[in-house]
Amino acid sequence: MKPLSPLTLSFLLFVFITTLSLAFSNEDVEQVLDVNGKPIFPGGQYYILPAIRGPPGGGVRLGRTGDLTCPVTVLQDRREVKNGLPVKFVIPGISPGIIFTGTPIEIEYTKKPNCAKSSKWLVFVDNVIQKACVGIGGPENYPGIQTLSGLFKIEKHESGFGYKLGFCIKGSPTCLDVGRFDNDEAGRRLNLTEHESFQVVFVEAEANDAEFIKSVV
């Protein structure tokens, strides 16, 4: 492995210190942890589960909704015993590899159906139900449907327990929480909301414990 030059090393150290300084200058910013108190790291595989298990349902997975021909809509499984599909978090650009609350991130599934252009999460506008919903893929998967570019983030939930996801629209100061919407489908859709956010926790997924795409409908 080629050793890093002093200039590169200094730059990376500067980025790391600057990020930490910005993070800890805000008392509300903290490192995101999984249910076992371990830090969440980019590239790791995690299940997104409801903070309160039971009738509220299980983890998040993919499903086919509306007139979409590919299972690209992100749904919360109605079955509380299901963990859903694991995701990984990516910090765009150069980063110290630490995810704090409020850090802009990309979220993507570790597996995707062949018909999906990408495994990355995005937001599409379903005009039938008048909701901005979370999905994966690319514009090709949403013919005639508006898709929104932007980045996600993780914040502490208002209750003080668990976290919530947010989405910030590219080129706009607008950021909205991710909530749930029940449209009497195979699962509850994840959608952008100004009201009740989806209270979640993160569970590290074992490599041999991932559910496969056959679980989608």
Swiss-Prot record:
Pfam families assigned: Kunitz_legume (PF00197)
Intrachain S-S bonds: C70-C115, C168-C175
Glycosylation sites noted in the Swiss-Prot or TrEMBL record: N191
SUPFAM superfamilies: STI-like
Compartment annotation: Secreted
GO molecular function: serine-type endopeptidase inhibitor activity
GO annotations of cellular component type: extracellular region
Alphabetical keyword list: Disulfide bond, Glycoprotein, Protease inhibitor, Secreted, Serine protease inhibitor, Signal
Cleaved signal peptide residues: 1-26
PANTHER family according to UniProt: KUNITZ FAMILY TRYPSIN AND PROTEASE INHIBITOR PROTEIN (PTHR33107:SF21), KUNITZ TRYPSIN INHIBITOR 2 (PTHR33107)
Protein family according to the UniProt entry: Belongs to the protease inhibitor I3 (leguminous Kunitz-type inhibitor) family.
Role according to the record: Might act as a protease inhibitor involved in plant defense responses.
Name of the molecule in the record: Kunitz-type trypsin inhibitor-like 2 protein
Organism for this UniProt entry: Pisum sativum (Garden pea)
